[in-house]
C-alpha cells in the first residue's frame, strides 16, 4: 500500500512540473558555469537555446548532452561573436565614461542595438543547424528591425534580470534558465515553423 502511494506521487502532474522546473534551474546553473570564462558567453547562450529547441514536444531531460551538442554547433562563429561582444561592450563602456551627453546617449543606443543583434543571432543559430556565417549575419540584422519590439522586450527582461542579480547574486543560479525560457518564448511568438 505504501509503495502504491509513492508511485502515485511520482505520477502526478505536480511532480512532472517539478522535474521541468528543476531541469531549467540545472540548465541555468550549467549556463553560469560555462560562462565563467567570459569568452564563452555566446556559445553557452546558444547552447541554452539549442537545449530548449530539443525539448520542444519531448519534455525536458538530457541537459548535459544537449548543452554540449549546442556548444559544439557553430562554435567558431559563436566564439568570434563572443570576442566581438567583449570588445564592443568594452568600447561602449569607455564611451559611457565620457562627460558629454551626446556620447553617453550614443553609447546606450549602440549597446541596445548590438544587444538586439546578439539576441537575434542566438535565435537564428538555435533555429538553423546548417547555415553559413553570412546567412546568420544577414538574418540577424533583418531580425533587429523586423522583430524590433520583441527584441526591445527581451532586452528589458534581461536588464531587469541583471538588476535583480545585482540585488541578490544567487538569483542567477535560480532564475537563469527561466529567464532564457521567457526570452525564447518572446522571440518565437509568431515565428513558429
Predicted regions mapped to residue ranges:
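Helix-coil boundary and N-terminal low-complexity module in membrane systems
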Residues: 1-193
Amino acid at each position: 500500500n505504501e509503495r502504491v502511494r509513492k508511485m502515485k506521487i511520482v505520477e502526478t502532474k505536480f511532480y512532472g512540473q517539478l522535474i521541468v522546473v528543476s531541469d531549467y534551474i540545472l540548465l541555468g546553473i550549467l549556463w553560469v558555469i560555462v560562462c565563467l570564462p567570459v569568452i564563452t558567453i555566446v556559445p553557452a547562450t546558444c547552447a541554452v537555446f539549442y537545449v530548449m529547441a530539443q525539448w520542444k514536444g519531448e519534455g525536458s531531460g538530457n541537459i548535459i548532452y544537449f548543452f554540449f551538442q549546442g556548444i559544439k554547433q557553430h562554435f567558431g562563429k559563436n566564439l568570434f561573436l563572443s570576442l566581438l561582444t567583449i570588445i564592443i561592450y568594452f568600447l561602449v563602456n569607455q564611451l559611457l565614461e565620457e562627460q558629454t551627453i551626446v556620447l553617453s546617449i550614443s553609447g546606450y543606443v549602440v549597446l541596445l542595438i548590438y544587444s538586439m543583434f546578439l539576441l537575434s543571432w542566438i535565435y537564428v543559430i538555435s533555429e538553423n543547424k546548417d547555415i553559413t556565417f553570412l546567412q546568420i549575419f544577414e538574418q540577424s540584422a533583418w531580425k533587429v528591425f523586423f522583430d524590433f519590439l520583441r527584441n526591445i522586450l527581451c532586452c528589458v527582461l534581461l536588464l531587469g534580470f541583471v538588476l535583480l542579480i545585482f540585488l541578490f547574486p544567487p538569483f542567477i543560479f535560480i532564475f537563469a534558465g527561466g529567464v532564457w525560457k521567457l526570452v525564447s518564448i518572446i522571440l518565437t511568438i509568431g515565428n513558429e515553423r
